[in-house]
Amino acid sequence: MPVDHIPKPSDGAVTGGFIALYTLAQIGAFVAFIPMLNLLLPLKAEAVDLSGKAVLLSQVMVIGAVVAGFANLAAGVLSDGTRGPWGRRRPWIAGGAVAVAATHGLVYLADGLWSLIAAVVAFQIALNLMFGPLNAVLADRVPDHQKGTVSALQGLALPTAGLFSAVVLAIALGGLAERFLITALAVPLLVLPFALLVPDHSEAGLPATRPRFSLGVLTDRDFRLAFTSRLLVQVSITLNVLYLLFYLQDVATLPSASGATAETAFGWLMTAGTLGGLIFGFIGGILSDRTRRRRVLVMSGGVLMAVGAGLMVAQPVWPGPLLAQIVFGIGLGLYSTVDIALVAEVLPDRSSAGRDLGVMNLAITVPQIAAPLIGLGVLLAFGGELRWVFAISAVFAFVGAIAVMGIRRVR
């Protein structure tokens, strides 16, 4: 039964059924790209070029991120202007979910630099055609007094995807083909129920004019500060995601008695950090609705991420990396969850929510370009010493955390 057939609360709040399916769809969207970035693509780069894996990974990530930025902005503009029986967002969400599954197969089959680049480009286009319109649903459909609660559940998507990557892919499964297949199947299974069962009436009452490509929303001071904060923190996140496995292989001293490999240690670190992020992210989202003080919670999350990245520099001997990733994960869960609600409130115009969130998404995709370049520059400057990459990560997280406190429209 379509979720909108469930009686609606009189205050305009979204229903429990809507929230449940939307949360599952968000988890599916994050499962689409978190395992790809932190495990599948690094392992594929290693399989294609063992000796040059870090450089190859950086090259592929930069090109893919450029494509992702344009694709997400295009998806936002296109879905803002889409009209029809399926509404503005649903056609793009459903079609993108199926395409993401197919492009996982392309990445797996790639056997060289150019085929891997082509596969990642196709993957990023499919991902962002799904992800941009899905993110716009929060601004379209959820009233302000529920944004923190829905964001608390939506914020579970990132750490849950990390848990999927750590437990299912890194620990439970051993073959690269199995890892790609399970991920490809999980995405449409989680995303399509929302796209198929929840009617989209977000275009009701909006002007018939179609939004255009524009970066004009960056002239809004509060939006610009939220963008800057997310941009800086995402550089920190991307550096941690990209180089954690290589850090465990080449820098960390793992417990010799346990016989742990870098991949299994990666799985356990991701699991520990994810569990911390799940708990604190959920609590933070609920508190941000009840207190309506989102900025200080976002700032606290960014500061904790900076502390965690700093511990990676200072304590490479076990259990230092474990403690570092727990602290980083707690900060990431808190920051990412509450920041979702903060950004949804900062948007100046509902009719162009998809486009403006596409602009905001540049704060995620630009770091996917910048972070590999920064990481590569640091590695070249410091003789391949990975600990300096995490030192830079700590600086970006801290500055990004402080930036959010200048926002005025949201407390």
How would you describe each model-predicted region?
Residues 2-15, 201-229:
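Juxtamembrane intracellular "pre-TM" segments in multi-pass secondary transporters
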Residues 6-65, 224-229, 233-259:
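Helix-loop boundary and gating motifs at the non-cytosolic
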Residues 41, 129-142, 334-348:
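Intracellular juxtamembrane helix-capping segments at the cytosolic ends
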Residues 58-79, 268-283:
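Central cavity-lining transmembrane alpha-helices of secondary-active solute carriers
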Residues 67-69, 148-170, 361-372:
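Glycine-rich segments within core transmembrane alpha-helices of 12-TM secondary carriers
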Residues 71-86, 280-293, 379:
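Helix-to-loop junctions at the C-terminal end of transmembrane segments
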Residues 88, 171-186, 259-260, 377-397:
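A membrane-interface helix-boundary motif in multi-pass transporters
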Residues 89-105, 296-311:
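Structural signature of the two symmetry-related core transmembrane helices
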